[in-house]
Amino acid sequence: MRLRTLVCLSLVGGACALAATGFPRRIGLTASQADVSLPGDLLLPGANVVVDRGIAIDAPASVVWDVLGHVFEPADEATIIEIADEDHVLMHVAAPAAPEDAPASGTCVIALLPLSPSRTLLHIRERHEAHGRERALVWAGVAAESLSSLSMLRDL
């Protein structure tokens, strides 16, 4: 009985600690950085699944933009809503873990925010509007994709 209680309390404590970091809502960003308004936020004002990912890069925005141009290629050019050089790319995206033929009903922005002349914050925000069971599935997909998102950001 004591071992079971210890395990349960450890799991609850771990879950609380994880939730306190903002996971899975945000990774690599402070709460104030995640609260910044980004392009595309008004395209889906009723979004109830909002996920922010970020990493500070020791390079100016122009260099980061060039690297993104070499490694980033959307699967379908029609999903791109707007491109502002050295600032952001805004696109339509399907919900995480959605079937391949699912409509791109959400938005995703990849924004470059200068922290200093030689340091840039790469901020990725994904927004979806989902209800009921679908919302739970989207959050499950977000949580499952979080580790790969973090790995991708670190590889940049």
Residue ranges with predicted function:
Residues 9, 81-83, 152:
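Hydrophobic transmembrane signal anchors and adjacent membrane-proximal interface regions, especially
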Residues 33, 93-156:
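Beta-strand/loop substructures that line and gate deep hydrophobic ligand-binding cavities in soluble
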